[in-house]
Amino acid sequence: MHLRFLVRLLALLVLAAVPLAPAAAKPAPVWAFEKSDLAPDPAFRFGRLPNGMRYVIRHNASPKATAEVRLQIDTGSLDERDSERGFAHFVEHMAFNGSTHVPEGEMVKLLERAGLAFGADTNAQTSFEHTLYMLSLPRNEPALLDTALMLMRETASELTFAPEAVERERGVVLSELRDGQGYALENNKDQLAFLYPAAHFRDRLPIGTAESLKAATSAALKAFWAREYVPAKTTLIVVGDFDADAVEAAIRARFADWPARKPARRPGQGRVLFDQQGAARIHLDPALSERVTVSRHGRWRREPDTAESRRVGLLRQLGYGVINRRMQRLSRLAQPPFRGAGVGTSEVFHIGRTTNLVVDTADKGWRDGLFAAAQVYREALAKGFSEAEVAEQIAGVRTGLENAAAAADTRSNDALVGAVIQLLRDEKVPTTPASALERFNRHAASLTPAAVLAALRADALPLRNPLIRFQGRTAPAKDAKAGAQALRATWNEALRAPLRLKVSAPSGTFAYTDFGAPGTIASDVTRADLGLRQIRFANGVRLNLKRTDLEADRVLVRIYLDGGELLDTKANPTATEMTSMLPTGGLGKHSLDDLQTLLAGRSVSSSISSSGDAFTLGAGTTRRDLELQLQLLAALITDPGWRTEADELYHQTMTNFFARLTATPSSALSNTLPSVISGGDPRFTVQPPETYQALTMARLKADIGDRLARGAIELTLVGDFDPDAAVAMAARTFGALPAREAEFRPYEAERQRSFTPKRGLTVIRHKGEANQAIVRYVWPTTDDSDPVTAMGLELLQEVAGIEVLDVVREALGKAYSPATSSSLSRVWRGWGTFTVNASVDVADVAATRTAIETTIAGLAAAPVDSDILARARAPMRERIDNLLKTNAGWLALTERAASQPERLERYFKARQRLDALTAADLQALARRYLAPDQAVVALVLPEGAPAPDK
């Protein structure tokens, strides 16, 4: 102790004698947690090389024998100078296009041979402040890790920027810029210009501008990369099933000789105008739904991540949560004042912060919506919150923390990488879930309504004389000036008017805990090869159980109920259209809003969709809440509320749907092509708007009520549960229901679907940007009944995808993400499609068509190249091998184990069938199904653009 004091004293004397030394005597923290009282999770290993590059390593075996590798460069579009707009993103593209040791075009091939699919396992992204390179390793082989690290080092310090490679990639980047244009981007740009006129970031969208991208030279891009890609701005992350010591040694061996360089300073970021007030803006577009945003700005506050700042942040979170919950209650009334509303305060990089009140309304409903939302906001800040409201929010927070702590040991690689990314970008310390729960419990008693209100008042910027922005299809008044005055007058009136909006919270308890006498078991067998237990209850309900230890305390629930889209007929094609709205109508004894309060703090949810030959219900829950989850889903099937609140929300949603029907090329295509290729079959055709406005919960009840009451049910549980306890829970819920049909109906007549006899060109028009087009080829194939053919077409899809990507993207530079797809139906007899798609410039339609037709014809003309075949097959092998390393994979395999047992056998033989396929097999499939004259060729063109004759 005395020695420590002496050392400190000597240090002080040295500092006093050398006044210029302090800056060098105390180095800046390397990691955010070094200036926090929060301890990082000790399972993470943090390090820094002498050159300044940082790294984070963590051993983790979820999923087993896999890993995630990330390279983050602290450089984004905010680091660009005026002549460099889009350069950070352009450089990201060039990382895949040639380096010292990997020639142009070889990086993706190298990874594909190793089993990494381009896009799914190999990707990158650029934001305002960062560039992130991502590799998902399907195996934990040291050689594969070495390859990943080698490629990351190539990206960091060895890119070549060959002029011809830059020129080829320029077309790809420009196509990505083109594809992103449209009403949504223009609306976003207008909002940024209004709210932040003096800020730099509004002119630094990562995609850049056409002018700067066209002007980018090899030398200019290389100069940007050399300036920004330096060790001090770089962090490497490796999380997965590798020995941490071995990973650290590999990182040092690969990156230690990267020369250190001084990082460039980021240019000035402009300003947020704290005194900006009293202005209004109106932005109109036929595709925009109505929204009013009320805003005020304030100064940015430096708040390091500490235990105290998290406590204060939690208080703020609770306050905003209560206000937004009040608004949610109003949005669920039979005649709501708005579709949705919310309030929050967020940072604007490091130059300011903004409080926004956002109100979404039906067309021409802005006045009532703005008035109501303003009153909710006023009342909260003036009068505070009730104990019950705060308790409801606390319950949700507590449960989230408890669930995280329970599942801590089996967090996925992706989740752990996400925690590291938060540390790097937001300086949020990656603490253990257990410590987060402990801190919450320590502070829980202090989370009072008064404390919540005080924290909220200190954080939210007063919305006095605010900025008001309107977006929508119809102006709020006859001209801009009158519209601005109307918006301001409504806001001011809402601030003066007496507070009169009251929505009471429910009382009582969840009413669906008794479904009758528990069901008896008619049969109970276990497949030893899968550890899959299969039970049939006496009432006909079937239960599949697969217990795993892959995700601690997590249980996935899936229910298939007979019916689905097969209830849609040519005479009644929208019979199941509103199915997904069923939970919005609540239950017979509880509204949806009541359920949210009654079940606060419980890990349960409900959803239902009409999918293929069944209605599908799904949820994720915990061991503790498994029975409640089953009760909730059983109640949704046996006693849905059918409330008219769901009608109102659905009709508003469909109004917006039709406003955007052809607003972009992709929406025009997706809403038109199914009808085209199905010969105008009403079941696959968008009906007139009035058809959807006539749909109601009452009509849905008439159309699907019988299936809910009597249809066959298959229930599957996958995850961490006690099997016998789970069987008893199922017996008390689904097993206790009245007798169901024992089997799923065959629906033979309803399964008929015919591909249009009209082949060749069809033109679809869109109302988007004048230079945007889509080229899509669709060939009819077959259904999914033959596993060998299905596997062959899937492999052919991968081969064609590589070929099309190489030609349309890499060689021609015409499209950002050309794609192929083989889709074989398990529902419609004989129905399947093989699709090639590319989003291109209108001027490039003809060249793209030629490239696609030539590529597909080549697949039929000759056996595929052996290297391309290997690159296509390897990622498929990895997907098969890794399927059962997650609960989601087990669920996909077992969810129809009783009604479609052939799926299990197909899985066991999948790898063998894949490996047996030859180049000649694929050539035969291409000849059989991909004949040039058998395709429907859909061209999606702007309105008014000339179309080819054929």
What are the functions of these language-model segments?
Residues 157, 165, 170-220, 224-233, ...:
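Hydrophobic, small-residue-rich alpha-helical packing segments that form membrane-like cores
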Residues 56-58, 63-82, 86-88, 105-154, ...:
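M16 family metallopeptidases and their MPP-like homologs
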Residues 212-252, 692-731:
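Internal metal/ion-chelating core segments
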Residues 23-57, 237, 243-314, 319-328, ...:
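Proteolytic maturation boundary segments
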Residues 94-102:
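Metal-associated gating/positioning segment near the N- to mid-region
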Residues 8-18:
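Bacterial N-terminal signal peptides
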Residues 1-5:
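N-terminal secretory signal peptides that target proteins for export/translocation
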